Swiss-Prot record:
InterPro entries per the UniProt record, alphabetical: Aldolase_TIM, GatZ/KbaZ-like, GatZ_KbaZ_carbometab, TagBP_ald_GatZ
Keywords attached to this entry: Galactitol metabolism
Taxon lineage: Bacteria, Pseudomonadati, Pseudomonadota, Gammaproteobacteria, Enterobacterales
Functional description taken from the UniProt entry: Component of the tagatose-1,6-bisphosphate aldolase GatYZ that is required for full activity and stability of the Y subunit. Could have a chaperone-like function for the proper and stable folding of GatY. When expressed alone, GatZ does not show any aldolase activity. Is involved in the catabolism of galactitol.
Protein's pathway: Carbohydrate metabolism; D-tagatose 6-phosphate degradation; D-glyceraldehyde 3-phosphate and glycerone phosphate from D-tagatose 6-phosphate: step 2/2
Name recorded for this polypeptide: D-tagatose-1,6-bisphosphate aldolase subunit GatZ
PANTHER family: D-TAGATOSE-1,6-BISPHOSPHATE ALDOLASE SUBUNIT GATZ (PTHR32502:SF12), N-ACETYLGALACTOSAMINE PERMEASE II COMPONENT-RELATED (PTHR32502)
GO biological process: D-tagatose 6-phosphate catabolic process; galactitol metabolic process; phosphoenolpyruvate-dependent sugar phosphotransferase system
Extent of the signal sequence: none
Subunit structure: Forms a complex with GatY.
Species this protein is from: Escherichia coli O6:H1 (strain CFT073 / ATCC 700928 / UPEC)
Length: 420
C-alpha cells in the first residue's frame, strides 16, 4: 500500500480497488481476475462480518486470512500479493453497549486483526455508544481512534510495522447502508476533513503515537457517491474539487466508500481527484446474484421439473422466513418487499448465500447445468455480455466461468479507473 500511495502522490494515475466481501466466489473472482497481472489485490473484512467473536460469517480475523489464502492457493494467486484490510474497526458492532465496554471489545478487535496479519487498518470510532451523545464530538472520535491505534501498535511486530497502514475518518452516513431512498448526498467539506486530520494528529501525539502517524495513509470522506435500493448518486467531479486540492497539501490520499455502481469513467475521475482507494462490495455480490438468477432461469427451461433446484423459490422462502438481514432496510408492502429482496442494489441477499438451504439449492443448480449443453441462444438471452465473449473465444459456456465473468464485469470498470 505504501508504494502505491507514494506513486500516486508522485503524480502517477494509480489507485486500488478494495474488495469488501466474504463470499468465496467473489474473492475467487478478484484473485483470478488479477492472477496474470503484477497488481496486488486488496481484500477487506468489516468488523460486523469478521471479529474476535466470529461476526456474522462465523470467522475470526485469523480464520478469514486462512479462508482467503486457501482460495488464493486454489486459483494460483501468490499470497504475498494479497493485502488484507479491516474496515470500520471500532465500536460499530457494540453500539448498544456503554462506551467503556464497547471500546474494550474494540481494542481486542484491532489486536486480533493485526495479530492475524492484516496490514490496512481503518480506525473508526465515529459511532455513538449507549451512553454517548449523538453525534460524538470530533475530539472524542479522535481520542478513541488513538486508543485503537495504540492497541494495534502494541501487538505489531517490527516486521509488521513496516507494512502497517492506518485509515482514519468515516463517510456519511455511518456504516450500515441507506435504509430509505436518497435524492442527494452531503459531500465532505474541506474544513471537516482538515478537522478530522487535526484532531487525530493531536490525539495520537498525546498518546505517544507520533511515529504511528506516519503510517496514516488515507482519510475517509464522502466525495458525493452513494446508492440505495434503486437510486445511484453519480460522482460529479466539479463538486469535489475543493477536497481534491486540499489533500494535495498532505502525504495522504482519500478512501471513498460506497463507490458501487459508478461508471468506469467516474472511477477514473475519482482516482484522478485523489480518491485513490475505492471500496466496492454490494456491486460484486449483485453481479453474482444476477449470474445465479440468470442460470436459474436457464435451468428452469433445460431441466425436468422433478430435478430442478428451485433456487429462486428457495431464496425467496428463506428470506421471507428469516427477514432479520433485510427487514429494516426494505419497503414494507409484500410486493415491494419481494422486488427489493430480489433486485435491490443494496443486495441484502448477500447475507443469505451461506444459508444451508440456499447453498444446497445453488449447488444443485450448478450440477444440473454442468450436465447439459447450454444453448448459445439462452446465454445471449440471459447473459448477453458473456455471449459476446463466448463468440470471440474468450470464455466457455461453463456455469462457473459464466459467474466469474459476470463478477469480472464489475472489476473491469475498477481496473479502468485505477490502472496507471
Amino acid at each position: 500500500m505504501k508504494t502505491l500511495i507514494a506513486r500516486h502522490k508522485a503524480g502517477e494515475h494509480i489507485g486500488i480497488c478494495s474488495v469488501c466481501s466474504a463470499h468465496p466466489l467473489v474473492i475467487e473472482a478478484a484473485l483470478a481476475f488479477d492472477r496474470n497481472s503484477t497488481r496486488k489485490v486488496l481484500i477487506e473484512a468489516t468488523s460486523n462480518q469478521v471479529n474476535q467473536f466470529g461476526g456474522y460469517t462465523g470467522m475470526t480475523p485469523a480464520d478469514f486470512r486462512e479462508f482467503v489464502f486457501a482460495i488464493a492457493d486454489k486459483v494460483g494467486f501468490a499470497r504475498e500479493r494479497i493485502i488484507l484490510g479491516g474496515d470500520h474497526l471500532g465500536p460499530n458492532c457494540w453500539q448498544q453497549e456503554n462506551a467503556d465496554a464497547a471500546m474494550e471489545k474494540s481494542v481486542e478487535l484491532v489486536k486480533a486483526y493485526v495479530r492475524a496479519g492484516f496490514s490496512k487498518i481503518h480506525l473508526d470510532a465515529s459511532m455513538s455508544c449507549a451512553d454517548d451523545s449523538i453525534p460524538l464530538a470530533p475530539e472524542t472520535v479522535a481520542e478513541r481512534a488513538a486508543v485503537l491505534c495504540l492497541a494495534a501498535e502494541s501487538v505489531a511486530t517490527d516486521c509488521q510495522r513496516e507494512q502497517l497502514n492506518y485509515v482514519i475518518g468515516t463517510e456519511v452516513p455511518v456504516p450500515g447502508g441507506e435504509a430509505s431512498a436518497i435524492q442527494s448526498v452531503h459531500i465532505t467539506q474541506v474544513e471537516d476533513a482538515a478537522n478530522t486530520l487535526r484532531t487525530h494528529q493531536k490525539a495520537f501525539i498525546a498518546r505517544g503515537l507520533a511515529e504511528a502517524l506516519t503510517r496514516v495513509i488515507a482519510i475517509v470522506v464522502q466525495p458525493g457517491v452513494e446508492f440505495d435500493h434503486s437510486n445511484i448518486i453519480h460522482y460529479q467531479a466539479q463538486x469535489a474539487q475543493a477536497l481534491a486540492q486540499w489533500i494535495e497539501k498532505t502525504k495522504m490520499v482519500y478512501e471513498a466508500h460506497s463507490t458501487d455502481y459508478q461508471t468506469q469513467x467516474a472511477y477514473r475521475e475519482l482516482v484522478r481527484d485523489h480518491f485513490a482507494i475505492l471500496k466496492v462490495g454490494p456491486a460484486l455480490t449483485f453481479a453474482l446474484r444476477e449470474a445465479i438468477f440468470a442460470l436459474a432461469q436457464i435451468e428452469q427451461e433445460l431441466i425436468a421439473p422433478e430435478n430442478r433446484s428451485r433456487c429462486l423459490a428457495v431464496i425467496e422462502e428463506v428470506m421471507l422466513d428469516e427477514p432479520q438481514y433485510w427487514k429494516k432496510y426494505y419497503r414494507t408492502g409484500f410486493n415491494d418487499s419481494l422486488l427489493d429482496i430480489r433486485y435491490s442494489l443494496s443486495d441484502r441477499i448477500r447475507y443469505y448465500w451461506p444459508h444451508s438451504r440456499i447453498k444446497n439449492s445453488v449447488e444443485t443448480m450448478m450440477v444440473n447445468l454442468e450436465g447439459v449443453d447450454i444453448p448459445l441462444g439462452m446465454i445471449s438471452q440471459y447473459l448477453p455480455k458473456q455471449f459476446e465473449r463466448i463468440q470471440s473465444g474468450e470464455l466457455s459456456a461453463i456455469p462457473h466461468q459464466l459467474i466469474m465473468d459476470k463478477i469480472y464485469d464489475v472489476l473491469r470498470a475498477y481496473r479502468y479507473g485505477c490502472a496507471e
